[in-house]
């Protein structure tokens, strides 16, 4: 793919909820953390919807069904129906269905979300390698997924059965912090078998295809908290993205982002959907946003001025990404970020 290398966050003269017809929202770390809504999420989403924006919830978490996800969101005060939810389970089920016959048995290492998605594609979920599956699919199964389930996957894969994974997120955010995600479980099976799975979830094309097919979005905006899934998925799909800082990405990771991990816009939380985005402009040897000016020095990023912390971060992104070009920035931004409280 040939794309222009992004060297700064973009500005927007109108609210993002007006500039785009559909928000493709990640869930964990964006809308909620654990069982609780993230601050400002409920009101921001209600305002965006009232203004005519279609909201779709796109998650790499394959554990729960779209019905269950919609129910949870509705309980949090975000009215949602199952058709508003797109999961990596649905994407991987479509991928499998394109390679095996209707009615084929598929060994499931994961939760109910995978089973429901497979049945929707006319496939039969099974639990044992002895059930003669023609494929193995692995997705997040929650904290109670046992070692014996990984063993069943290994037994089937050793017989030459193709292996699929809903996603490879190494971590998942929760109310108590960061926990192992499906990617960590996939690594267990990979190491044990030496096999490589076909992966459907963000940032790969099968998930983007599933999302566009189900939403019909024409001017989508990906909204996420992860650089290596949400933002890279938007890059691969050639659509714009908004990074919110309510999940796993911190300022240092953002400054060091290679081109495929650089978002179109950066904001603190989902309130960023409701506003225009400030311009980052060249200023001498550096870049200015709001009251801050950032420059790339010999070994570090330097920041002068005062104002909103997010404006300082946007200016630092421009200095870092411009200095790095097509690579990841190696300049130290620690002092500048500390000055912003980030």
Please provide the spans of the model-predicted regions.
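Asp-based, Mg2+/Mn2+-dependent phosphohydrolase catalytic module
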Residues: 2-25, 33-35, 42, 47-50, ...
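Receiver (REC) domain active-site loop signature in two-component systems and cognate sites
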Residues: 29
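Glycine-rich loop-to-alpha-helix module at the N-terminal edge of alpha/beta enzyme cores
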Residues: 58
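Polytopic endomembrane small-metabolite transporters, centered on the Drug/Metabolite Transporter
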Residues: 88-90
């Amino acid at each position: 793919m040939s794309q222009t290398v992004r060297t700064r966050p973009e500005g927007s003269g109108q609210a993002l909820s007006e500039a785009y017809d559909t928000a493709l929202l990640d869930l964990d770390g964006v809308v909620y953390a654990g069982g609780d809504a993230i601050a400002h999420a409920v009101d921001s989403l209600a305002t965006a919807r009232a203004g005519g924006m279609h909201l779709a919830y796109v998650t790499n978490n394959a554990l729960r069904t779209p019905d269950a996800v919609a129910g949870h969101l509705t309980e949090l005060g975000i009215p949602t129906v199952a058709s508003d939810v797109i999961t990596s389970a649905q994407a991987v089920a479509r991928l499998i269905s394109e390679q095996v016959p209707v009615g084929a048995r598929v060994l499931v290492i994961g939760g109910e979300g995978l089973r429901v998605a497979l049945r929707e594609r006319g496939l039969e979920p099974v639990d044992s390698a002895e059930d003669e599956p023609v494929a193995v699919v692995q997705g997040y199964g929650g904290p109670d997924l046992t070692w014996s389930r990984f063993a069943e996957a290994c037994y089937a894969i050793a017989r030459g059965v193709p292996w699929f994974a809903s996603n490879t997120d190494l971590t998942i955010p929760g109310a108590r912090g960061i926990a192992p995600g499906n990617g960590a479980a996939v690594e267990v099976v990979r190491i044990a078998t030496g096999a490589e799975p076909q992966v459907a979830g963000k940032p790969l094309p099968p998930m983007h295809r599933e999302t566009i097919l189900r939403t019909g979005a024409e001017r989508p905006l990906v909204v996420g908290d992860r650089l290596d899934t949400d933002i890279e998925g938007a890059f691969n799909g050639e659509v714009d993205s908004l990074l919110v800082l309510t999940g796993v990405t911190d300022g240092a990771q953002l400054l060091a982002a290679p081109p495929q991990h650089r978002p179109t816009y950066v904001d603190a939380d989902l309130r960023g959907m409701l506003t225009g985005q400030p311009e980052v402009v060249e200023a001498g040897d550096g870049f200015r946003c709001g009251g801050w000016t950032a420059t790339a020095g010999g070994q570090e990023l330097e920041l002068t001025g005062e104002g909103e912390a997010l404006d300082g971060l946007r200016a630092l992104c421009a200095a870092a990404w411009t200095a790095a070009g097509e690579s990841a920035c190696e300049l130290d931004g620690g002092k500048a970020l500390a000055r912003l409280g980030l």
